[in-house]
Amino acid sequence: MSILHDLAATIEARKGADPDSSWTAKLLAKGPEKCAEKFGEEAIEAIIEAVKGDRAKLVSEGADVLYHFLVMLAARDVALDDVLAELAHRQGQSGIAEKAARPKG
């Protein structure tokens, strides 16, 4: 099991936890929209560090992005394995060809 699977399992376990005792539970209790908003904030912070070229801060923000992505998935009951299966499906395809094959609209 990977660290991402371990983290996803921990997040899933915190769904029913007391929001006063867990940051993850507190975030999940605010609903999927807030989880998505927080993911977006963290993604922007990672972008800023990437542009600045600060490797250490980018690594830290990257970890935040991954955590908040997993929280956002959990808030919508989407399993990490579903996302990984989609990546596996796309593996070996040209990104251009994959994008062109997506349904329009």
UniProtKB/Swiss-Prot annotation:
Provenance organism: Ruegeria pomeroyi (strain ATCC 700808 / DSM 15171 / DSS-3)
Keywords recorded for this protein, A-Z: Amino-acid biosynthesis, ATP-binding, Cytoplasm, Histidine biosynthesis, Hydrolase, Nucleotide-binding
Compartment list: Cytoplasm
Record protein name field: Phosphoribosyl-ATP pyrophosphatase
UniProt pathway: Amino-acid biosynthesis; L-histidine biosynthesis; L-histidine from 5-phospho-alpha-D-ribose 1-diphosphate: step 2/9
Alphabetized Gene3D superfamilies for the sequence: MazG-like
GO molecular function: ATP binding; phosphoribosyl-ATP diphosphatase activity
Enzyme Commission numbers on file: 3.6.1.31
GO biological process terms on file: L-histidine biosynthetic process
Gene of this entry: hisE
UniProt family annotation: Belongs to the PRA-PH family.
EC class (word): hydrolase
GO cellular component terms listed in the entry, alphabetical order: cytoplasm
Lineage start: Bacteria, Pseudomonadati, Pseudomonadota, Alphaproteobacteria, Rhodobacterales
SUPFAM superfamilies: all-alpha NTP pyrophosphatases (SSF101386)
